[in-house]
Amino acid sequence: MQTLLDIEEIKQLKARYFRGIDTCNLELLKTVLADAVHIRFDSPTYQYEINGIDEAMNFYRNAFTHRRFGMHHGHTPEIRVDGDTATGIWYLNDLFINLDEQTILTGSALYEDCYTRVAGQWRVQRTGYKRLL
C-alpha cells in the first residue's frame, strides 16, 4: 500500500513541476526540486545541463516569462519506488511560444526522473528529457 501512496505523491509532484513552469511560479518550483537537482534537456536543436537549485531557478526565471511561455502535459508515467528513492519515465507533449523570436515549438519527449524523499517529502533529484519530435 505504501508504494501506491508514494507513486501517487510522485505523480502530484510532477504535476506541480509542470504547473510551476507553465505559470512561471518559481516559489512552487523550488518546493519541487531537491537542492542538488541535476537537469538535462536534449534536443536536436538545443542542449541544456543545469546543476543545483540556484542554477535551476535562474534558468526557469529566464526561460519562461510573459513573452516566452509554454504548456507541458506529462502523462503515462512509469514509476518505480525503492524505499526513499524512485525513478520515473513520462511522456511529454508540449508547446512553447516565444514572442520575442516569433517562434512556436510543439512536440514530444521522454522525461527520465530520479526522486528522493527528503524530510518525508518527495523531491526531484534528477530530471531531463530527450526530444522525440
PLM feature segments, named:
Residues N62-L133:
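A beta-strand edge to alpha-helix "cap/lid" segment located at domain peripheries
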Residues L26-Y91:
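A solvent-exposed, acidic/Ser-Thr-rich amphipathic alpha-helical stretch
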Residues M1-T23, E27-T31, D35:
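Short, low-complexity N-terminal intrinsically disordered segments enriched in polar/charged residues
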